[in-house]
């Protein structure tokens, strides 16, 4: 069963378009990486300068646009790449896009049959994280992947729900992996 929220459409394209419009004032400057949820210091603050105090009457210029699937993931920025985790129908996709052009550099995909117990969007529910040349994602069914940042090739994966016998819960798994000191930390379950 696939809900309408998991099909590509106007809202996801609009969401990415708004993000790109917000980044437009910074085009030509080297933006800081935003390698995981809440940014470089995990505090939601950006050190960038030169933000517009007010948008032009016609709105900010659109750099490019891309149709994307559903989910709750935020976009991660690393080395001029946008890393996006999204779902189209019954497939989860991790995409690397060139931040300047929107051109897809690679895509890693895998099937999912996860459905939210209460009919909300079926995910993914958390952002990717980039650390030391790897992209880490945790899907709503509890599959943790590590992909090579430059190619998107799978380095390894683990089904943490199966390995640790975690019962299904309200939201599935939905916490962005935390990578520090060469170790990956994941919230394995909860309410």
Where do the PLM segments sit?
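Bacterial N-terminal signal peptides that target proteins for export
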Residues: 2-16
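Bacterial N-terminal signal peptides
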Residues: 13-25
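Noncatalytic, solvent-exposed loop/strand surfaces
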Residues: 28-191
